A protein has these predicted regions:
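Extracytoplasmic/secreted cell-surface and envelope-processing proteins
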Residues: 2, 80-81
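Hydrolase active-site cap/lid region
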Residues: 2-61, 67, 114-117
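Hydrophobic/aromatic beta-strand patches that form the interior of the parallel beta-sheet core
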Residues: 18, 70-72, 102
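Conserved beta-strand elements of beta-rich interaction domains across eukaryotes
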Residues: 24, 52, 76-77, 108-110
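Short beta-strand/loop motif that positions the catalytic acidic residue
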Residues: 64-66, 70-73, 77
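C-terminal catalytic histidine-bearing segment of alpha/beta-hydrolase fold enzymes
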Residues: 82-89, 94-133
């Protein structure tokens, strides 16, 4: 959602935000990455991320969005865990009455990159279009 941070600084605002497989915070994403787990006891990942200015704190950014927010996430996403997208939605829902979450079931085998190929994808897009009209 980093480009959204730039959009939030502009006077022009989009009609809605559509997020596909987002994460809530970079620190949570890094800590959920399998190769990072052995290092958790050796280093403070959060401090390192903050020191190199890579916090990508989407939870904070999303609190400033008043437009509708639509989040899509596949349950079998192996890159960004589903629970991180859901956690971001929970924050959005608390701050915006227009937040919607569209989960895609694990049995569809969509992973991180293939939500667009799901049969229900067109239905989700139509819902978004109808809400934004």
């Amino acid at each position: 959602m980093f480009p959204a941070n730039e959009v939030l600084q502009e006077k022009w605002r989009p009609d809605a935000y559509v997020l596909e497989a987002p994460f809530n915070k970079m620190v949570d994403e890094v800590e959920s990455f399998a190769l990072a787990k052995p290092f958790k006891c050796l280093i403070n990942i959060q401090t390192i991320i903050e020191n190199i200015d890579l916090a990508f704190d989407n939870e904070t950014l999303i609190k400033n969005i008043k437009e509708p927010i639509f989040i899509m996430h596949a349950e079998d996403d192996g890159i960004i865990p589903f629970r991180l997208g859901k956690r971001l939605f929970d924050v959005a829902e608390t701050n915006s009455c227009n937040a919607r979450f569209f989960p895609f079931e694990k049995c569809l085998h969509l992973g991180h990159d293939n939500i667009y190929s799901a049969d229900q994808f067109q239905e989700v897009v139509q819902v978004i279009i109808n809400i934004c009209r």
